[in-house]
């Protein structure tokens, strides 16, 4: 609860009562503001005026480096910094000059200290600006953009008071144009504005709300918003809030720039213990996209520090997926490339008293408040001998670890740097029986590769302190770690452990089952890489976690396939139709456009014979209101043929079911136009078609409230339907795995790798957009 004294102090500084109460809820901010006010009061020896108070509040709200706060408070209290513009310049200066001492002469020059802008100077600058635009002003009068005059005058007088400039602009414009007339009060027509808004909508950033995305596809870097727009330039790591500066920082950054030439460097560092999923696609796009947008480079680095969980197939699959998405790594590296250097640095930490060998068991280190290690203060000479013994295999797994002496953001004390593992490594064999942890490896590999922007998902925020601490403890270049929100999808699970459970339960076939959202599964289902990249771009990069609807990803898929997938015709539930008056003694060759909306993309031929097959759902014995397809007394057109068929006879099987139809045909232009045209096949290929739906029935299958029985109890029994006797036109006969088609009126389909000579297997990628008028 706010104390009366504190509330009075903050309102006395110029804060509204609501703002003061809000500030008091933030203990760190209110403490800093109280300290700043106390210092200012000591300097002034009197009550702090509101203008000074507002600047003090602005200062403590924006400055995270408390070392410089006292320095700037003294300038504010002494009225050397007395405008918001000067304060912004001062904050930028101290961020750009992190090392003491500050060059006060240079600082004051950059912040306009002592600069006095007279009313005469303001009058002269405004007059010069108005003279420059006088003809346009006289023509447009008060419809002229007065902000332009303000901006140019302020540019000429950087430290002038903004209100004084505005008053002078208003006065001189009034003197030039006179009072506003009736015509000046008429609002501008909105036509031009509407056109501008229409253009803006086509290029503006998409807005993500409640899992919905609006707007057109832009590149991922055009979608960057929020904190990502404030990334530091290479070599200016110290400008990042929270970045730790040591006496060695500036020299190390100078060396870093000499090595990189100021180049942006990012990395995508997956663990090779599973298959990449849709969330990784965002990480790939962000890391590779940011580097590409800034003419930089991106490493693909495998974090191979867990030998018992790593398999060769995962290395291959990860690399394949990165390149499938269209990215080429600058270099493929492995954490194991640096094992020798990492070990040498671990020894250095022990020498410096910053790491020790501990014998607590894994179970003792778990939980929120594990007991402190009784070996934390053992002599470093002893830890050196024990660490060497660990390396030589003299401890069993779990008997000894190397721990670093620090406390992380989440309160975790002394994270493990090395542990004993006797599993042979896929690259180093049995050279090592101790392996570094993620907390130890990650930042040091970034340092070795001179990464400028270490982009991680939000769960790694708790490890940022160990990231900075370790680089600084070893006096090596320290990159900047920046965390962003993960991308999740409804109706999906992406956890490696849970996917393994799905496979073990027989719910899916493997990691690439098209019902999953692993990248290999999406590729098998037929999702184009461009669509996945577009989806990531639409979602954008924010600090907040994002959970999206699958239909938004599917919309991106349709956008790409509409222009990329040639058309074909297929029938899932065939009904034989015999044309009794077929107009030719042999089949006709029908020329079908690959893309009906753009016939310049070519044609293919399909046979049209006296026997065709249509969808059983495209026939009803008796027509109904609103029904437009084939029925008794209701003819229907056959797409692309130029013919209309009309029912003559229904042939039934022994069970009474309709077995085939006998129809007559006529030219479409020889009579009344039919209500509808349907797709068909003739002399077709028999194929297998797999139809996919959501794997789970609820949006959040992992939510114990929504699904009390666990995600395995939420499986959708209709998630896969196999149509074994489907028919498809012969234009697809030479299709290869992953070739994609639009089957007219049905959806987009991709050739599955299970296809073999004699039978093609198709996966339905996505349905067509729903047509409310189709009955």
Swiss-Prot record:
The lineage of its organism: Eukaryota, Metazoa, Chordata, Craniata, Vertebrata. GO terms for biological process: brain development; glutaminyl-tRNA aminoacylation; negative regulation of apoptotic process; negative regulation of apoptotic signaling pathway; negative regulation of DNA-templated transcription; negative regulation of stress-activated MAPK cascade. It comes from Mus musculus (Mouse). Belongs to the class-I aminoacyl-tRNA synthetase family. Glutamine--tRNA ligase. Plays a critical role in brain development. The keyword Cytoplasm applies. This is Glutamine--tRNA ligase. Keywords: Acetylation, Aminoacyl-tRNA synthetase, ATP-binding, Cytoplasm, Ligase, Nucleotide-binding, Phosphoprotein, Protein biosynthesis. It is an enzyme of class 6 (ligase). The keyword Acetylation applies. It comes from the Eukaryota. One of its GO terms (molecular function) is glutamine-tRNA ligase activity. The gene is Qars1. ATP binds at residues 271-273, 277-283, 457, 486-487, 494-496. It is found in: Cytoplasm, Cytosol; Cytoplasm. It catalyses: tRNA(Gln) + L-glutamine + ATP = L-glutaminyl-tRNA(Gln) + AMP + diphosphate.
């Amino acid at each position: 609860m706010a104390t009366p004294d504190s509330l009075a102090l903050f309102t006395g500084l110029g804060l509204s009562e609501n703002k003061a109460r809000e500030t008091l809820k933030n203990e760190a901010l209110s403490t800093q503001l109280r300290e700043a006010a106390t210092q200012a009061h000591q300097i002034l020896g009197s009550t702090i005026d509101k203008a000074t108070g507002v600047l003090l509040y602005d200062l403590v709200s924006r400055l995270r480096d408390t070392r410089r706060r006292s320095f700037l408070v003294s300038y504010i209290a002494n009225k050397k910094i007395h405008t918001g513009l000067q304060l912004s310049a001062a904050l930028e200066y101290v961020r750009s000059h992190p090392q003491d001492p500050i060059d006060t002469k240079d600082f004051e020059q950059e912040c306009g200290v002592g600069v006095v802008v007279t009313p005469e100077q303001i009058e002269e600058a405004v007059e010069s600006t108005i003279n420059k635009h006088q003809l346009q002003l006289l023509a447009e009068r008060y419809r002229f953009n007065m902000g332009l005059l303000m901006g140019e005058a302020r540019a000429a007088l950087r430290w002038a008071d903004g209100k004084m400039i505005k008053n002078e602009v208003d006065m001189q414009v009034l003197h030039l144009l006179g009072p506003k007339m009736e015509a000046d009060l008429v609002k501008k027509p909105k036509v031009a504005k509407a056109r501008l808004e229409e253009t803006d909508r086509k290029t503006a950033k998409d807005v993500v709300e409640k899992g919905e995305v609006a707007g057109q596809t832009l590149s991922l870097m055009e979608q960057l918003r929020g904190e990502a727009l404030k990334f530091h330039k290479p070599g200016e790591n110290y400008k990042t809030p929270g970045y730790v500066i040591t006496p060695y920082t500036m020299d190390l950054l100078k060396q870093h720039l000499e090595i990189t030439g100021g180049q942006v460097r990012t990395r995508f560092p997956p663990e090779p213990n599973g298959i990449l999923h849709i969330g990784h696609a965002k990480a790939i796009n962000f890391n590779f996209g940011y580097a590409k947008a800034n003419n930089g480079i991106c490493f693909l680095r495998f974090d191979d520090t867990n030998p018992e969980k790593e398999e060769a197939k995962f290395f291959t699959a990860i690399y394949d997926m990165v390149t499938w998405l269209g990215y080429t790594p600058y270099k493929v590296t492995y954490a194991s490339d640096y094992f020798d250097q990492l070990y040498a640095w671990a020894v250095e930490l022990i020498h410096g008293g910053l790491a020790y060998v501990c014998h607590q068991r894994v179970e003792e280190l778990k939980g929120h408040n594990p007991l402190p290690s009784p070996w934390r203060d053992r002599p470093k000479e002893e830890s050196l001998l024990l660490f060497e013994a660990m390396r030589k295999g003299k401890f069993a797994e779990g008997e000894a670890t190397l721990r670093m002496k620090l406390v992380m953001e989440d309160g975790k004390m002394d994270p493990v740097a090395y542990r004993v593992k006797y599993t042979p490594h896929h690259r180093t064999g049995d050279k090592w029986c101790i392996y570094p942890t993620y907390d130890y490896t990650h930042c040091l590999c970034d340092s070795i590769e001179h990464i400028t922007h270490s982009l991680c998902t939000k769960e790694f925020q708790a490890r940022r302190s160990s990231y900075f601490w370790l680089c600084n403890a070893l006096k090596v270049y320290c990159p900047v770690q920046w965390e962003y929100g993960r991308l999740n999808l409804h109706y999906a699970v992406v956890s490696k452990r849970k996917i393994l459970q799905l496979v073990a339960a027989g719910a899916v076939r493997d990691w690439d089952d098209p019902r999953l959202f692993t990248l290999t599964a999406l590729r098998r289902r037929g999702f184009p890489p461009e669509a996945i990249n577009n989806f990531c771009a639409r979602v954008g990069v924010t600090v907040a976690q994002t959970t999206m609807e699958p239909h938004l990803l599917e919309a991106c898929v349709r956008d790409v396939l509409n222009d990329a997938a040639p058309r074909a015709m297929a029938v899932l539930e065939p009904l034989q139709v015999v044309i009794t008056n077929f107009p030719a003694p042999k089949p006709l060759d029908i020329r079908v456009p690959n893309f009906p909306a753009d016939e310049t993309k070519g044609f293919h031929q399909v046979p049209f014979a006296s026997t065709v097959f249509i969808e059983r759902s495209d026939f009803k014995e008796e027509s109904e209101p609103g029904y437009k397809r084939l029925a008794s007394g209701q003819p229907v057109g056959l797409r692309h043929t130029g013919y209309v068929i009309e029912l003559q006879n229904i042939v039934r099987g022994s069970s009474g079911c309709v077995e085939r139809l006998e129809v007559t045909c006529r030219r479409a232009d020889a009579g009344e136009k039919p209500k509808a045209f349907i797709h068909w096949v003739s002399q077709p290929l028999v194929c297998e078609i797999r139809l996919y739906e959501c794997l789970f029935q609820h949006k959040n299958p992992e939510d114990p409230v929504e699904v009390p029985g666990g995600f395995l109890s939420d499986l959708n029994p209709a998630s896969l339907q196999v149509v074994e006797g489907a028919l498809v036109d012969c234009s697809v006969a030479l299709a290869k795995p992953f070739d994609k088609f639009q089957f007219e009126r049905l959806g987009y389909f991709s050739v599955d790798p299970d296809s073999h000579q004699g039978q093609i297997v198709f996966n339905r990628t996505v349905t067509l957009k729903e047509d409310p008028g189709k009955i």
